[in-house]
Every structure is written in C-alpha cells, then in structure tokens.
C-alpha cells in the first residue's frame, strides 16, 4: 500500500511531489529514461489520483521515446485500465449532478488521446496489430474513434488486413472472437462511417466485401499502396499489407464464384493486383 510504504520510508507529501516535478524536468530536457524512473516511483508512493494519471501519461511518453516497446505496451495497458476504471466510477451526491455532463466529455477526450498515442506502440510492438484490434474494436474505443477520431479507421482497417493469418487462430495461437471476426467488424464500421471518413484503404475493403467489385477493389488497392507507403506508422508494412490484401481478393473471388477463372486467381497476386 502506498500509504504504509510512505510511512515506512518517512516521506512527506512535498518529497513525494518532488519526484513528479523532477521527472517532469527530466522529460523536458530529453532524459526520457530518467523521467520514466522518477514518474514510476512517484506513482508507487503517491495517492493523488490526478497526478498519478498525469504520471501515467508522462511515463508512457517516455517509454515510447526510448523505444522500449514491451514496457510501453505494459504502461499503455495500465493507463487504459486506469481511464476505464475512472469512467466506470459513478460520482455520488452533489458531484453526480455537477459532473453529469463534464465526465463523459473528459472520458471521450482521454480515450481519444490514448487511441492516438497507442499507434506508436501498436505499430512497433511485434504483436501490436492484433492487440490494436482487441482494443479498438472494444465498444468504448470504437465509439471513441467514431465520435472523435474517424481517421483512425485507416489503422484499424490496415491492422485487420495485416492480421489475416492471426484471424484463423489455431491450437498453438488461439485468438479472441474479436480478432477472428475483425475484417467483418471493420467492414461494418467502414460502411457506417463512410460519410465522415474514407480513404483508399477503407474503400478497398468496401469494394471487396460490400460491393463485390473486384476490379474496383484492385484499383483502390493500387491507390492504397501509395497511402500505406507514405504513412508514418504504416510504411514498413507496405509489402505485408499488399500480400495479405491480394490474398483476400483471391479468397473472396473463390467464395462467390461457382466457376473460377484460374488465370484470374493466379495472376491476381502479381500483375493484376
């Protein structure tokens, strides 16, 4: 318990707060490893909810900037759990009336920031794309994306395509139903949110799975190749994205045609796609 540990170490509130301030100072001049250490120890000792949340953000930023992706993922998960717990805690008495409108907006704002910051982790950690699907397809975060950050649908769509193999699951690599049905769920969202956001990546999925227009899907894939290749988070996944997208075209074509043009299927992964 932080209180018993504080008493045992004989630390007062001013000394504990100094850890936060010094961690903030370390971050300001670029010593991100030092900042992460000070903010971590501050969190262990502090009982100030708001400062602890701020320290979470600071440590996550520090872990991202030092490229410690396993540590950053752990911090991201901890921060998400903290935000979700605060969102689920209903205030009582007069506070419930006063903050009835402010709390949902603050929660939306915090989750929107988390969604954006998480892109650094999810597109650098080896298991990041599957973990992105787990988080972004959860109702609370999908609602956040739809309400405050529809452009994040690009990253959701790319992750669904990149995680094609993971969606098949298996005895050695079981996956959740959320990941297993990711493409189907993403297509629904893409179709629903088309009025406020679309790009060649989302259009590719729509043409392939909603319109069943394979020529249009291939055209959008050509455009998506440029979009993915120029995107800060996605550029290194360009070839993997194309390979998986071409497979999805062939798979969809074979599913809906009783007679299959073998030349089409064979050529699709190379020249035609």
Task: State where each predicted segment sits.
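Extended alpha-helical scaffold regions
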Residues: 1-273
């Amino acid at each position: 318990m932080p209180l018993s540990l504080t008493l045992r170490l004989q630390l007062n509130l001013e000394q504990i707060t100094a850890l936060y301030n010094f961690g903030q100072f370390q971050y300001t001049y670029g010593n991100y490893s030092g900042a992460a250490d000070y903010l971590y120890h501050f969190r262990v000792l502090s009982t100030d909810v708001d400062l602890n949340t701020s320290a979470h953000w600071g440590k996550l930023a520090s872990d991202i900037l030092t490229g410690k992706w396993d540590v950053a993922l752990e911090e991201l998960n901890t921060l998400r759990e903290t935000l979700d717990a605060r969102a689920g805690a209903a205030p009582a008495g007069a506070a419930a009336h006063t903050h009835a409108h402010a709390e949902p907006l603050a929660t939306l704002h915090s989750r929107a920031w988390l969604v954006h910051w998480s892109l650094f982790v999810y597109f650098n950690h080896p298991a990041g794309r599957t973990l992105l699907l787990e988080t972004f397809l959860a109702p609370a975060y999908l609602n956040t994306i739809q309400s405050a950050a529809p452009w994040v649908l690009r990253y959701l769509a790319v992750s669904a395509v990149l995680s094609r193999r993971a969606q098949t699951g298996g005895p050695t690599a079981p996956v959740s139903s959320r990941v297993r049905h990711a493409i189907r769920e993403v297509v629904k969202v893409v179709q629903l949110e088309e009025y406020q956001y679309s790009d060649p990546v989302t259009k590719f999925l729509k043409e392939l799975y909603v319109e069943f227009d394979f020529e249009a899907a291939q055209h959008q894939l050509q455009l998506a190749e440029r979009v993915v290749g120029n995107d800060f988070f996605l550029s290194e996944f360009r070839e993997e994205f194309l390979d998986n997208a071409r497979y999805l075209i062939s798979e969809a074509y074979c599913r809906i045609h009783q007679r299959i043009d073998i030349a089409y299927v064979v050529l699709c992964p190379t020249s035609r796609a």
